Design a protein with these regions (language model features):
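Catalytic glycan-binding domains that act on GlcNAc-containing polysaccharides
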Residues: 32-122
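N-terminal Sec-pathway targeting helices
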Residues: 2-28
Length: 122
């Protein structure tokens, strides 16, 4: 009679662990896919960061892209608002990155002039 009580508990624990492992695999797979999508834009980010004199902020820019769009769509930096005053006007990822990096460079320069930290600029 004791065995019957332990078996459902073991089954429930096994199912819980199995679902947890499956969830972790899906989470890590999606995260890897997002990372790869963002890193596909790295060469354009490096080019624009060097052009705007903020090449030391490459990782920050890539992090912003990951946060804003996961590297998807035509406006990975969500920067059409700063260029055109409205969302969805950017049709090319390179244009979005150029505008976003330029705006970030201006914000960093302004933050340094005002004596505030980097995160205020971001």
């Amino acid at each position: 009679m004791r065995r019957k009580k332990k078996k459902p508990l073991k089954t429930a624990l096994f199912l819980f662990l199995l679902l947890t492992i499956c969830g972790a695999v899906v989470f890590f797979y999606r995260t890897k896919q997002q990372y790869q999508q963002v890193m596909a834009l790295e060469s354009e980010v490096v080019k624009q960061a060097e052009k705007n004199g903020i090449s030391e902020y490459r990782e920050l820019i890539l992090s912003m892209i990951l946060t804003e769009s996961k590297g998807l769509g035509n406006d990975p930096m969500q920067s059409s608002e700063s260029a055109y005053g409205e969302a969805g006007r950017t049709s090319d990822p390179s244009e979005s990155i150029a505008q976003g990096v330029s705006y970030l460079a201006e914000s960093i320069a302004l933050a340094q002039d005002q004596g505030v930290d980097l995160w205020t600029a971001v």
